[in-house]
UniProtKB/Swiss-Prot annotation:
Phosphoprotein keyword on record: yes
Primary site of residence: nucleus
Region (Disordered): 1-446, 465-549
UniProt protein name: Eukaryotic translation initiation factor 4B2
Further details from the record: Over-expression in sns-D leads to programmed cell death (PCD) in the leaves characterized by spontaneous necrotic spots on the rosette leaves under aseptic conditions. Embryo lethal when homozygote.
Amino acid sequence: MSKPWGGIGAWADEAERADEEQAAEATATAADSQSFPSLKEAATAKSSKKKKKMTLSEFTKGAYTAPSSAGLTREQMLQLPTGPRQRSEDEMQPGRLGGGFSSYGGGRSSGPPGRMSRDREDSDGSWGGGGGGRRSYGGFDDDQRGSNSRVSDFPQVSRADEDDDWGKGKKSLPSFDQGRQGSRYGGGGGSFGGGGGGGAGSYGGGGAGAGSGGGGGFSKADEVDNWAAGKAKSSTFGSGFRESGPEPDRWARGVLPSGGGVQEERRRLVFEPRKADTEVSETPTAVKTSKPSPFGAARPREQVLAEKGLDWKKLDSDIEAKKGQTSRPSSAQSSRPSSAQSNRSESSALNNVENVVKPRPKVNPFGDAKPREVLLEEQGKDWRKIDSELEHRRVDRPETEGERMLKEEIEELRKKLEKEAAIAPESKESQQESDSNHQNLPDLIREKEKNLDLLIRELDDKVRFRPRAVERPGSSASRGGSYSERPHSRAGSIDESRSVESMERPRSHGTGDNWPRPVDDRRNFQGSKERGFFNNRNFDRSSSAREGW
C-alpha cells in the first residue's frame, strides 16, 4: 500500500523538475529578448573590446535582411469573401438607405424602380415631392409609408465617363413660360412632409417616388442655367401648414391655373406725359414772377443807358480818363452803382448815373482843423522861435554872460526903435536920418536875435550831448579819468578803497559848484565789496612799507 505523502525523496525530485522547467523558460525568454535586453541585463553585460571586423563593401552596401511576412492561414483564406454580399429583397429596393441608415426616416413610399431618374415628367423635381419623392426628414406623416427606396446602381456606368464633351448634349434653354407650366420641374402642391401624389416641389412632400428608374434622358437642371429663377419659397415643416404653390416671378390677376396652363401676365401701364413740366416750360415767366425780386424794379445800368440812347462804354472810358488825370479812385467813387443803390427806381438810377460822372469832393477826416504851423503864421507868430524856446526850457543850465549881454542889447534896440517911432520928425533932414536909422534898427535886432539863438542852441547841445564816461566795476584806470572834477586825495589814504560812482549834478542858476551824487547805492556797495579785498591788501602793503621805512 502506497503512502499518501509519497516515497522518501519525492520532494527532491519535484524540486529538481521545477528548476529544470524554470531554466528552460529562462532560455526561451532570453532568446526572444536578445534583440531587446532588459536594463539589468544591459548593465551587467560586458561588451567585448575586440570589435567585429567587416569589409568596406559590406559597410557601404549593408547586409540586406528581407522582411519576414507571415502569410494568412488556410482557414483565413477560406473566410475571405469571393463576391458581393447576397442582399435581400428589402435591401434591393430603389430608395433604400444602406448600412446603418436602413431604418432612418421610417418607411418609404412605393414608386417605380430606378435611381433618381433624369426624366422627372411624372414626378416632383424637388426633395420629397409627390409621386414617389423622398420621404421627409425624420419620418413625418407615417400614414403614407411605402416601400420606395434607392436603387442599387453599382454595376451601372457613369454618364460622365461616356462623354468627353459634356456641352454637346446640352439642350437649348426653354422659354420662360414653358418652364413654368404646371409645377416647377414637374410638380404640383405639397410641403414638408405633406401627402398627396403629384404634389409640388417643396422639401419633404409625400407621395410617389423621387425619380424614375434607369439613367437615360436629360435632367431639367441641365436645361436651366439659373436655378434661382424657379426656386420655390421654403415652407414650414410638417403637414399642418400647406401652400398653394410656388411664388410666381410675375404678378398675375386671379387664381393661378392648377392644370398647368399659361399664366396671363398683367398688362403694362402706359402713363401719359406729365402736364406740369409742359406748363412750366411754356410759361417760365409766370413762375419767375411768383417770387419777388430782391432788387425790386432796378435794372442793370447798361440797359438803362441803352434806353436813354447813351453808350455806357464811352461813359466808362471818360470816367476812367478823368480818374487817371486826378488820382486813384476810391471805393466810393466807382463807376458802377453800389449794391445799396440797386433797389431804387429808374429815376433814381438815372440820377445816380449823372452823379457818377461828377467825382465827389474828398472829405477831410480832420474837418476844419489846420496844422499848428499854419495857425501860428496866421496869427503872426514864428513857430520856429517858439519851438527853440520850448527846447531851451527843457535844458537845465545857468545863463552865461554872453547870453545876458545879447539880450540886453536887443532890449535897448527895441526901446530905441519904439522911441523913434513915437517922436514926430521936426524937419526933413531929421526925417531922412530917422528913416535910415529906422531901417537899420530892425536889421540889427534880427541879427542880434539870430546870434542869440545860435548861442543858446550851442550851449544847450553841449549840455545835452556831453559825453559821459561809463566806469566798469573792476577798472581802476578809468576811475581816475572819470572823476577829474573830484578833488584828489592823498596817496595811500583809506579813501582809495572806497569807489562811489557819481555823475555831475546839474548846476543851478547863479552857482557854478559841481557836487557829485551817487547813482546806484547797491552797485556801489557791490563794487566796494569786490574791490575791498585787493584794496585792503594794498593798504596793508603800504602800511607795512611805512613801518619798514
